[in-house]
Design a protein with these regions (language model features):
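Intrinsically disordered, low-complexity segments enriched in polar/charged residues with Gly/Pro
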Residues: 6-7, 48-50, 82-85
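Acidic (Asp/Glu-rich), glycine- and aromatic
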Residues: 9-49
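A short linear-motif detector with a strong N-terminal bias
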Residues: 17, 50-52, 85-90
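Beta-strand-rich recognition/accessory modules
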Residues: 63-133
Length: 133
């Protein structure tokens, strides 16, 4: 079994590709990934709360203390969005499709920053980019 990731800049953000190759003789199923975006060291985002998070699966976004700077991430195929205030962090966790012997499965991810107040409009703009295809 092998896996890897590739990250490339595009459209003002990062497009991420994660892959899993099944070189075993057994099928792999129910493989979930936790991708944690931690804010502890990011000035303005380090507040330990979930009140600054917006969940629009597969997207999750977090704003700074002023509510004008946002970090946005998403992964597909999507399994769940969640946040952990004590960290503080946010997750858009994907799940690999079942992977038969000899197969390779892929996940697609996005990360970007946004400055402004129309976060829903920005998320729609990101969706319209088609980064997950």
């Amino acid at each position: 079994i092998s896996f890897g990731t590739h990250v490339a800049g595009a459209h003002g953000g990062l497009i991420m590709d994660m892959w899993l190759r099944n070189g075993s003789e057994a099928a792999l199923d129910d493989l979930r990934v936790q991708n944690c975006v931690m804010f502890r060291e990011l000035a303005g985002f380090e507040v330990q709360t979930n009140d600054n998070k917006l969940l629009l699966p597969p997207y999750i976004a977090c704003h700074d203390v002023e509510g004008r700077r946002w970090a946005i991430t998403a992964w597909t195929p999507h399994q769940r969005c969640w946040a952990n205030a004590p960290c503080p962090c946010m997750h858009s966790d994907p799940q690999f499709p079942d992977c038969a012997p000899g197969e390779t499965q892929r996940l697609k991810g996005w990360f970007s920053f946004y400055q402004g107040v129309d976060i829903v409009g920005e998320i729609q703009r990101l969706q319209d980019l088609g980064w997950d295809r």
